[in-house]
């Protein structure tokens, strides 16, 4: 089986708006998320979680930045297409924020390093 990193994406404005959801809306979203997680339990390697503030580090140092990544999971599947099929248009992340999207990136195996 191959492993894939799943990135739950949206604009920073959409994430800020989602954070203002009512307790009832939040519970409804979490219930849908847990149902989806249970459905794909056998494929879930790491349930991941929400992500916070971002630091960008380059040759000049570290600075605050924003990006569209709100959370992650790691799944396993036979193929990239099979992994993508786990995250259809009815996925809770896509339902909670109409402008949201999900990116699925294959995690490549690390070559053995000979010393």
Region spans (language model):
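Conserved, structured core segments of small domains
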Residues: 1-115
């Amino acid at each position: 089986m191959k492993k894939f990193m799943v990135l739950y994406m949206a604009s920073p404005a959409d994430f800020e708006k989602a954070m203002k959801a009512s307790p009832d809306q939040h519970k409804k979203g979490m219930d849908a998320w847990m149902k989806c997680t249970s459905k794909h339990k056998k494929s879930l390697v790491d349930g991941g979680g929400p992500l916070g503030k971002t630091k960008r580090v380059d040759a000049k140092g570290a600075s605050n930045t924003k990006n569209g990544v709100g959370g992650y999971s790691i799944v396993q599947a036979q193929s990239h297409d099979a992994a993508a099929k786990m995250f259809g248009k009815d996925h809770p992340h896509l339902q909670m924020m109409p402008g949201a999207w999900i990116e699925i990136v294959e995690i490549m195996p690390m070559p053995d390093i000979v010393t």
